[in-house]
Swiss-Prot record:
Cell compartment(s), UniProt: Cell inner membrane
Keyword hit for Electron transport: no
Residue ranges crossing the lipid bilayer per the database entry: 20-40, 86-106, 121-141, 146-166, 191-211, 219-239
Residues making up the signal peptide according to the UniProt record: none
Keywords: Cell inner membrane, Cell membrane, Membrane, Transmembrane, Transmembrane helix
Major localization class: membrane
Gene Ontology CC: one annotated term: plasma membrane
Protein family according to the UniProt entry: Belongs to the UPF0259 family.
Record membrane topology: Multi-pass membrane protein
Protein's recorded name: UPF0259 membrane protein SG1383
UniProt KW Membrane keyword: yes
Length: 250
């Protein structure tokens, strides 16, 4: 019997609704960790002020990003690199904790062993190093694909979408999980492509919303936006987990 997308969406929404409080708490907790870590690792306000030294908006409006970086001093480039690295690392840690905690929570609930959010994160600890490498590699490849030409990035996002579920469910390494995910993804494109595309569009919408709050320095606003982004990712992970369980049974 073929797997129906409508069944997957219904199962996803049922689980999301039944475990909403725990999922919301996990999304906000990982968002808070990500924001605090990014703030702790980022350059201080005085260092960030050096990025605007000697630059004028009128002069840089026509420049590409590469030209803008080339116009910076060595100190400004160092500050920019540190800020970018801090944001990337903080986001990566948040995504790893979210994926590990949520996938562990789903597995425990499916086995009729409900756990708290902190307990789920604790149980996922042995999986976190593997997920860290996996999510780093997949994020890097997808981002490169989106930067070069959008289509390859989307295809890579679809190809590697099942990898976190495979890594945690089958106890496989990052490369093997990515390889197995690719073969399954393109064999089940009709079930994966719409979900991944919706996830990409929803994350882009949250990013656009975040740009409207660039003048708002409130930690609460930043955490809430990150939490919303995490909820979107949580929906996709629930969908992917259910799909993979059905594929294993087929």
């Amino acid at each position: 019997m073929p797997i129906m997308a409508s069944t997957l969406y219904r199962d996803m929404l049922n689980f999301f609704r039944n475990q909403f409080a725990s999922i919301l708490l996990l999304a906000l907790l990982t968002a808070l960790i990500s924001v605090v870590l990014g703030h702790a690792l980022s350059p201080g306000s005085e260092q960030l002020m050096t990025l605007s030294d000697g630059t004028h908006l009128g002069d840089t409006a026509e420049m590409s990003l590469q030209q803008l970086v080339q116009q910076m001093s060595v100190e400004q480039q160092r500050v920019l690199l540190k800020a970018s690295a801090a944001g990337t690392l903080a986001g990566l840690v948040g995504n790893v904790l979210l994926a590990g905690g949520l996938l562990t929570m789903i597995r425990q609930v499916s086995n009729r062993q409900p756990v708290s959010v902190l307990r789920a994160i604790g149980l996922s600890a042995p999986l976190l190093p593997r997920l860290l490498l996996l999510i780093f590699l997949t994020t890097l490849l997808v981002q490169l694909g989106l930067l070069l030409i959008i289509v390859p990035g989307i295809l890579l996002a679809i190809a590697f979408s099942l990898a976190p579920v495979i890594a945690t469910s089958d106890d496989l390494g990052a490369i093997k999980s990515m390889r197995q995910s690719s073969s399954l993804a393109f064999a089940n494109l009709r079930l994966l492509a719409p979900a991944v595309l919706f996830w990409l569009l929803a994350k882009a919408a949250v990013l656009l919303l975040a740009t409207q709050f660039t003048l708002v320095s409130s930690l609460v606003a930043v955490v809430l936006l990150n939490g919303l982004s995490n909820l979107i990712s949580a929906l996709l992970l629930i969908y992917l987990y259910r799909l993979y369980m059905l594929l294993r049974q087929a």
